[in-house]
């Protein structure tokens, strides 16, 4: 069941607090749940309802890979031999421009003209640390599902820097607010959230910014 069926956007608007929306987690005893299996959007690559990041230096094809995943999910086509669960995708192109639409069209042509009607794009950043922006994302997801008939399975924020506002990437407090916003998006939509992120000046040191981010991720790709 889609999380939007459980927690309405009206409830979100009226609550005044995101944390109060978290449903009470059930108590589990002993080894209950030991045999639960992880479900995937892309088998063995992107788990369902997960927080994922791709990071690397400029020009390392991070966005190219993220968009390729998006296209395969929107089409339901297997990706590199991995089974794919078809669904809608929201791609937030925070850097704007027409590059994303051109890449999508190239993908369609390469795959025999297959139209990606389940792939929705925003050509402007959104800021998960801002509660009002989270509401906007939820509204977009409802609209996308209504239009396509498929729930949003993946939300891509490209890039973290563009969707971070004026906050300090090195601040654990600011990064914590960003992470909390992404968690709320996951909770209320049931989608996975994928962040496209940069390395710092020293590539060997990994992704740029606070270590709170990698600690919060379910999967990280370099």
What are these regions (language model features)?
Residues 72-76:
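Active-site catalytic microenvironments for nucleophilic, acid-base chemistry
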Residues 45-50, 192:
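Short amphipathic alpha-helix starts
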Residues 65, 69:
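Hydrophobic positions on the alpha1 helix immediately C-terminal to the Walker A/P-loop
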């Amino acid at each position: 069941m889609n999380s939007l069926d459980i927690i309405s956007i009206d409830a979100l608007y009226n609550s005044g607090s995101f944390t109060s929306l978290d449903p009470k987690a059930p108590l589990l005893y002993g080894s209950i749940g030991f045999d639960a299996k992880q479900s995937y959007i892309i088998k063995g690559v992107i788990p369902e309802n997960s927080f994922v990041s791709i990071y690397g230096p400029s020009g390392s094809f991070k966005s190219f890979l993220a968009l390729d995943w998006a296209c395969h999910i929107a089409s339901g086509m297997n990706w590199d031999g991995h089974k794919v669960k078809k669904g809608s995708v929201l791609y937030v192109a925070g850097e704007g421009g027409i590059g994303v639409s051109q890449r999508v069209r190239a993908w369609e042509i390469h795959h025999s003209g297959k139209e990606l009607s389940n792939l929705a794009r925003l050509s402007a950043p959104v800021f998960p640390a801002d509660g009002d922006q989270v509401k906007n994302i939820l509204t977009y997801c409802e609209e996308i599902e209504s239009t396509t008939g498929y729930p949003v399975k993946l939300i891509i924020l490209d890039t973290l820097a563009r969707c971070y506002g004026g906050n300090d990437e090195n601040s654990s407090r600011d990064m914590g607010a960003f992470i909390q916003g992404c968690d709320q998006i996951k909770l209320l939509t049931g989608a996975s959230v994928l962040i496209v992120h940069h390395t710092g000046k020293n590539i060997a040191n990994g992704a740029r910014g606070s270590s709170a981010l990698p600690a919060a991720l379910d999967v990280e790709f370099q």
